[in-house]
């Protein structure tokens, strides 16, 4: 996630807030935006193969409505992230916010990770006793995140050079990670 360093209290911008903002910007129901995000891997691969990603094969910069839906969503979310960052202190989780706001000096870019077994245990605790499905769900989620991030940033997801702080929540625990992040923001 990414945090704008400011002395006042931060506003959290989870995925759902960005979905609603993107939906309003491009005129689609938020449920469609969320559903499209869930199926993003296949469409990004398809768009990439067809050479239709934003900025790749367009002779001039297209209007937002002329872009594929996945691109419209990204552009609208990018705009929402930039506008929220201008308004005040905030925390973004995902959506390439670290990359979108990379030129700002008041940004703390954090990547929290854990080993697969620890993540699996946490997922089972969170989502219930669906162990046989959780492992595949985690794999697909990581794959979608990696493809999304790498497509829009041309950088490797999880590469330490993209972050100011990387924390292993499996070794440190969630509470210690929160404490360290709060100290880093000061």
Q: Which positions does each model-derived feature cover?
A:
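Short, amphipathic alpha-helical "lid/cap" segments that border enzyme active or binding sites
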Residues: 78, 174-182
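Short, small-residue-biased leader/transition segments that mark boundaries at the very start
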Residues: 3-18
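Conserved beta-strand scaffold positions in the cores of enzyme catalytic domains, especially
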Residues: 12, 107-109, 164-166
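Short gly/ser/thr-rich secondary-structure transition/capping motifs
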Residues: 71-75, 90-94, 147-151
């Amino acid at each position: 996630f990414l945090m704008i360093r400011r002395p006042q209290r931060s506003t959290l911008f989870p995925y759902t807030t960005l979905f609603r903002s993107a939906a309003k910007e491009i005129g689609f129901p938020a449920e469609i935006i969320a559903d499209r995000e869930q199926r993003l891997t296949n469409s990004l691969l398809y768009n990439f193969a067809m050479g239709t990603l934003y900025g790749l094969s367009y002779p001039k910069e297209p209007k937002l409505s002329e872009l594929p839906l996945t691109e419209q969503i990204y552009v609208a979310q990018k705009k929402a992230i930039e506008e929220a960052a201008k308004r005040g202190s905030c925390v973004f989780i995902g959506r390439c916010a670290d990359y979108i706001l990379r030129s700002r000096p008041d940004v703390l870019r954090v990547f929290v990770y854990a080993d697969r077994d620890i993540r699996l245990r946490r997922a089972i605790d969170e989502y219930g006793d669906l162990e046989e499905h959780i492992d595949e769900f985690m794999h697909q989620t990581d794959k979608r995140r990696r493809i999304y991030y790498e497509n829009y940033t041309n950088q490797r997801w999880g590469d330490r050079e993209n972050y100011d702080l990387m924390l292993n929540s499996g070794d440190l625990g969630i509470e210690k990670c929160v404490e360290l992040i709060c100290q880093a923001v000061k």
